């Protein structure tokens, strides 16, 4: 164990001749390089803090302003309207300065004050400009002169070369809608789903709330919105995510898949080496705030970047009543799971990141390790897959001291978690349905004990070289993880690449210490809890009916020819498919985002509208003409786009009602209206995965590098979860989930109805997959 000896910086022994002191120069060198690395990161954070703190100005602009002020002073011009003279008189009390020094100090102080005032003015002006959302409601492709002038003003006040968090202080706060507006929009959303007598009863409850308890709750909510940076996000994180006592696996965590058709190497360790290195390059860019903030409308309107902060070095810690999120400023290791064993792998050597070939070497060492799991070790992660309360109690009882605490700390404080899976997964052209379904289920839950579901994300590499992610949901939403994942897939295949033999490029380094086995001492009582959690998780995992498939008949390229939003098109297809599948309409959830506002997360678009129901009925009514159906489609798609825009601009329904409900609980008052609203099940939960957030390659020039997207488990026991990604111009990937235990649902049947619905709608426009119109 030479590497163990190298880890000891010095040793001493007492002999009859005195103390024998031995120094390990290599260990001392590594300690020095590690300390140097830490100080470099601290300096970069300090520098970035200054740059972000003065944005949209720059530190160098301070010198320009001060020099300008001093120049005018020496030209006998007073730019301060007497302020410099007042500062000078104040400095006369300090007898240690000459008259010339006082003039210089006065000029510098005034220049600094003027510079700060300019920064505040620019920042506030940008916030006012970004509070305008009229551009969102203009017809696509038609921009008014006023909007163009507004865009020009935004660009002027946005500064140059923004860093990731540069716009945070300039983003407006999420507005609180009027209670009556939210109530009216809610009633409009449930009108097509309720019988007449039920709707009358709900209308009475809603109107009573709007004039009675609602305004009182609204007053407290507005008070919070003035004090907090976002009146929704902290409560959403706590009450929707962290206070949930059920399993995270399937119910909350979601997954991301690899490239659909491309497999750059079949060597598991090589794929892991390249991808882990790419992930760490992304983390370095994140630490340095070099990731470009996402901007809409031609890279003009910034979105909030707050969710990036906890991407790495983060773990969800179980509690009996509520979980907490533990985030470390830095982590220099990852933990790798393989064949029931846990290994700690250091990410740095000689003060630098391990190169891809060196990381491959470390992964291969783990794969070649023939040691057996310790008692209770193999299925330990099942604790993170089961109910939260048993895991919290078990953690407190058995992991609070000794080697168990040290090993658990290593897992929870790791940069992220890695699983070297023993199975082969991925798309197979000879059996696309079975292969994609198996791939999705493996990433969603695996064997229930080979992913650490509490980590911000678990990176999974399969035996054949395919890879994927399983992400915990509380710390951020899917678009943030999708941004990382796009970067990793791009860097892995198109920049790092592989040698002809499939290995990572570069050379191995025999001087790098071997990965370290984590040591556990898991008593029998704890192993019983592990088995109980595993049984709970297995029941949940085995109940998931998953169907993932690429829809290749057409994509958004042809949908655009219909002069409608591709998202609206897919949502109406989902409504038609659900009606064909179930023979009825249901409350539908589509995830939108509120990141136009500071610390914004998500909002719900209620996609099942009166207009969409009219369109679906027309589609299944043979008496309706194509012209009538097209007219209803246009009305339904326009209504959907309007609802989506309202959600994005802070005028959604569900987050406002949720926060009013939380206030009512704090005040210990009951609201029959809010109680009924928040108990309504979402039997169709949908989400679109964003694509091409990272400008590293062009899909038109690299059409084979298409992503499979990602998915999630069913939200309701008797409903469907549907995720979709519009890839390039010619492909849409769908991920459909439901539960076998529900006799009414069938994911494959829904998939067939969805394909039919997509084809039926495109046929209305006289278009097809081979259309040249």
Swiss-Prot record:
One of its GO terms (cellular component) is membrane. Its EC number is 2.3.1.21, 2.3.1.-. Pfam families: Carn_acyltransf, CPT_N. InterPro entries: Carn_acyl_trans, CAT-like_dom_sf, Cho/carn_acyl_trans, Cho/carn_acyl_trans_2, CPT_N. CoA binds at residues 555-567. Residues 74-102 are mitochondrial intermembrane. The active site is at residue 473. It is a multi-pass membrane protein. Changing residue 710 to E: In CPT1AD; loss of activity; loss of carnitine O-palmitoyltransferase activity but not the lysine succinyltransferase activity. The keyword Mitochondrion applies. Induction: Up-regulated by fatty acids. It is found in: Mitochondrion outer membrane. Pathway: Lipid metabolism; fatty acid beta-oxidation. Keywords: Acetylation, Acyltransferase, Disease variant, Fatty acid metabolism, Lipid metabolism, Membrane, Mitochondrion, Mitochondrion outer membrane, Nitration, Phosphoprotein, Transferase, Transmembrane, Transmembrane helix, Transport. Residues 2-47, 123-773 are cytoplasmic. The chain crosses the membrane at residues 48-73, 103-122. Strong expression in kidney and heart, and lower in liver and skeletal muscle. Inhibited by malonyl-CoA. Changing residue 360 to G: In CPT1AD; reduced protein levels. It is linked to Carnitine palmitoyltransferase 1A deficiency: Rare autosomal recessive metabolic disorder of long-chain fatty acid oxidation characterized by severe episodes of hypoketotic hypoglycemia usually occurring after fasting or illness. Onset is in infancy or early childhood. Homohexamer and homotrimer. Identified in a complex that contains at least CPT1A, ACSL1 and VDAC1. Also identified in complexes with ACSL1 and VDAC2 and VDAC3. Interacts with ZDHHC4. A conformation change in the N-terminal region spanning the first 42 residues plays an important role in the regulation of enzyme activity by malonyl-CoA. This is Carnitine O-palmitoyltransferase 1, liver isoform. It comes from Homo sapiens. The lineage of its organism: Eukaryota, Metazoa, Chordata, Craniata, Vertebrata.
């Amino acid at each position: 164990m030479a590497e163990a000896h190298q880890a000891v910086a010095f040793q001493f022994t007492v002999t009859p001749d005195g103390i024998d002191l031995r120094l390990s120069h290599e260990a001392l060198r590594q300690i020095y390089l590690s300390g140097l690395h830490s100080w470099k990161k601290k300096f970069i954070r300090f520098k970035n803090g200054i740059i972000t703190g003065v944005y949209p100005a720059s530190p160098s602009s301070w010198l320009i302003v001060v020099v300008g002020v001093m120049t005018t002073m020496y030209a006998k011009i007073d730019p301060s309207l007497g302020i410099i003279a007042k500062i000078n008189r104040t400095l006369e009390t300090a007898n240690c300065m000459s008259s010339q020094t006082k003039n210089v100090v006065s000029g510098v102080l005034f220049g600094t004050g003027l510079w700060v005032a300019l920064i505040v003015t620019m920042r506030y002006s940008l916030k006012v400009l970004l509070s305008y959302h009229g551009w969102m409601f203009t017809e696509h492709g038609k921009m008014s002169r006023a909007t163009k002038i507004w865009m020009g003003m935004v660009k002027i006040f946005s500064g140059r070369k923004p860093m990731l968090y540069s716009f945070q202080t300039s983003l407006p706060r999420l507005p609180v809608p009027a209670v009556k507006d939210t109530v009216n929009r809610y009633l409009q959303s449930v009108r097509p789903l309720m019988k007449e007598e039920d709707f009358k009863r709900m209308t009475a409850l809603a109107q009573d709330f709007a004039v009675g308890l609602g305004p009182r709750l609204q007053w407290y909510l507005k008070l919070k919105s003035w004090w907090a940076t976002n009146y929704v996000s902290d409560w959403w994180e706590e009450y929707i995510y962290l206070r949930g006592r059920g399993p995270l696996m399937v119910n909350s965590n979601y997954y991301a898949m690899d490239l659909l058709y491309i497999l750059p190497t079949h060597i598991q360790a090589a794929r892991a080496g390249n991808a882990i290195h790419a992930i760490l390059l992304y983390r370095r860019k994140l630490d340095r705030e070099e990731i470009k903030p996402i901007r809409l409308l031609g890279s003009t309107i910034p979105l909030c970047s707050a969710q990036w902060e906890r991407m790495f070095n983060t773990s969800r810690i179980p509690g009996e009543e509520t979980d907490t999120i533990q985030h470390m400023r830095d982590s220099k290791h990852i933990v790798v799971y393989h064949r029931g064993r846990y290994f700690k792998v250091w990410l740095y050597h000689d003060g630098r990141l391990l190169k891809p070939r060196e990381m491959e070497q470390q992964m291969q060492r783990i794969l070649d390790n023939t040691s057996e799991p310790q008692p209770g070790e193999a299925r330990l992660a099942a604790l993170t897959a089961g109910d939260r309360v048993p895991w919290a109690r078990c953690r407190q009882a058995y992991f609070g001291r000794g080697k168990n605490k040290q090993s658990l700390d290593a897992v929870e404080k790791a940069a992220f978690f890695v699983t070297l899976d023993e199975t082969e997964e991925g798309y197979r052209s000879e059996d696309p349905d079975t292969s994609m379904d198996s791939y999705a289920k493996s990433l969603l839950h695996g064997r229930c004990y080979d992913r650490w579901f509490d980590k911000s994300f678990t990176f999974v590499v399969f035996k054949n070289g395919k890879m994927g992610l399983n992400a915990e949901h509380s710390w951020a939403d899917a678009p943030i993880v999708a941004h990382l994942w796009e970067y990793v897939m791009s860097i892995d295949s198109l920049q790092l690449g592989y040698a002809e033999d499939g290995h990572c490029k570069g050379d191995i380094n025999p001087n790098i210490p071997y990965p370290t086995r984590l040591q556990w001492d898991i008593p029998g009582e704890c192993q019983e809890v592990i088995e109980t959690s595993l049984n709970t998780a297995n029941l949940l995992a085995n109940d998931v009916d998953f169907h993932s498939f690429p829809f290749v008949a057409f994509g958004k390229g042809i949908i655009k020819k219909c002069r409608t939003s591709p998202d609206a098109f897919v949502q109406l297809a989902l409504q038609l498919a659900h009606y064909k599948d179930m023979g009825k309409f249901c409350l539908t959830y589509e995830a939108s985002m509120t990141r136009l506002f500071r610390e914004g997360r998500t909002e719900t678009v209620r996609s099942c509208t009166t207009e969409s129901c009219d369109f679906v009925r027309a589609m299944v009514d043979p008496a309706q003409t194509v012209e009538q159906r097209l007219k209803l489609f246009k009305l339904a798609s326009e209504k959907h786009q309007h609802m989506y825009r309202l959600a994005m601009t802070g005028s959604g329904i569900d987050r406002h009602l949720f926060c009013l409900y939380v206030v009512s609980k704090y005040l210990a008052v009951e609201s029959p209206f809010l109680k009924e609203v928040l108990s309504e099940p979402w039997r169709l939960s949908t989400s679109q995965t964003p694509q091409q957030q990272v400008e590293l390659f062009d899909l038109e020039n690299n059409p084979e590098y298409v992503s499979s997207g990602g998915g999630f488990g069913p939200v309701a026991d008797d409903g469907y979860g549907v995720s979709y990604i519009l890839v390039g111009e010619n492909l849409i990937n769908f991920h459909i989930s439901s539960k076998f235990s529900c006799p009414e649902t069938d994911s494959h049947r829904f998939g067939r109805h969805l394909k039919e619905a997509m084809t039926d709608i495109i046929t209305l426009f006289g278009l097809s997959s081979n259309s040249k119109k």
